Amino acid sequence: GTAPQELARQRARYCAALEQFELYFGPGRQVQVYSAPGRAELGGNHTDHQHGYGLAAAVTLDLVAVAARNTDGYVRVKSRGFNKLDVIDLATAEPQEGESTHSASLIRGIAEGFRTAGKAIGGFDAYTASDVLRGSGLSSSAAFEMGMACIWNGEYACGLDARAQAGISHYAQYTYYVKPSAQLDQLAS
């Protein structure tokens, strides 16, 4: 669409995400808005996790997260289009049985990655709305992972650069989600 049409669409999208956050987590909270893009592989598809080269670029489709810190040691994430509210107790660091291949495993793994990096983190509540559709080939999982990493990095002033956040996100995907991969997707997101 035209620039004014796209601006109106994005404004409505962000406002809807804020409204949904308030619906699930209550009004009047101090929130921040985070964005993590999907990615397109321009060359070397699947060669990156075979120790080869790949080329990727971020795309304009992204995951938007409205988030606020909490003090109870839990992470709660509600994602548009999914019926489940992910609730993760940060006191439990190790991978949980039955959790791999679910978003909760990524959140738990990213938390452990931040702790391993020596960063003090805590809980948060978040609502996510993603235009990076599952199965689209644009790495919705990397957008989700990087969105979660951005929330911890921002809410808890961790000071990690994008490359370090990508490394943590990759660790979570490989170790907790149990999906062998390289860092191409996370680095592009």
Enumerate the language-model features and the residues they cover:
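ATP-binding N-lobe of GHMP and related small-molecule kinases
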Residues: 1-142, 146-162, 168, 172-177, ...
